[in-house]
Amino acid sequence: PFYAVTVNGVSVDGELLKIPRLVWNIERGGGTILDSGTSLTVLASPAYRVVVAALSKKLAALPRVIMDPFEYCYNWTSPSTGEDLAVPVPDLAFHLAGAARLQPPAKSYVIDAAPGVKCIGVQEGEWPGVSVIGNILQQEHLWEFDTKNRRLRFMRSRCTQ
């Protein structure tokens, strides 16, 4: 199932990104849904470009790797030691209606794609078009969908432990 949510913005490392507001407006050809049946998050093209630019700028110290179907992948392994590099993943947050903030763990948007390779797990969607917050980004949270009162509640949870 999927549920419409109101996104007011997205931030990377606490900096609110300059994404046109109409991207989040269903009446202007945009909008956002939370979909448990879609794995990766898909952002409408204007939002995608801004979000991946901000994330990739923070990951610029890592060598880029080409790996379909992802556009932004990085070699996270030191060529000299074979160990994972200690490069911090920037924080990503979706600012929702009612001052709610969805701040997923890094593993939900910078995902392991192959040994030593991590990719930005967000895909580019059409514009105009609806953005989709997929189930990988929803992980490590408990969700409550109150359809009768049209409310969504969520909280961080170590569901896997």
Place the predicted regions along the sequence by residue.
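Active-site palm subdomain of RNA-directed nucleic acid polymerases
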Residues: E15-W24
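Aspartic protease catalytic domain
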Residues: F2-V5, G9, W24-L34, T41-P46, ...
